[in-house]
Amino acid sequence: MQEIKITRAEQRKEKPDSSKLVFGKYMTDHMFVVDYDEGQGWHDARIVPYAPLQIDPAAKVLHYAQEIFEGLKAYRTADGSIQLFRPMDNVRRLNLSCERIALPEVPEDLALAGITELVKLDQEWVPYEKDTSLYIRPFVIGLDPTLGVHTS
């Protein structure tokens, strides 16, 4: 499996009050990104500071909605350790969706390693309160900058 390069955020965001969490409102300090092209496959795996994505205006995701997403949770156990809820099931569903819309499947070991490393790096975002969790939203988008119906 390829190495995942980590670039830490220089400034950390203020964490929300765990008693007032709102789904989808707060983003962690980092994100996991991997590039793909036919020649190299999935490459340049990295965890970087959370930031907007730069997308070509002709990207497939914008014109043909070529994208998929999944969702899983990281939560704290009674002893304070962090667990992911069924991460391999999540990765398999992600790849099944990729197959269905002709996006390249992400190697399972790479996806799991990226999610795991991201949660380790941003572990202070996983709340301690009962019935709370950190929601993780893996997604794959078609970025091929061409118009016309074909795979990205």
Model features per residue range: what roles?
Residues 1-152:
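Conserved alpha/beta cores of soluble small-molecule-handling proteins
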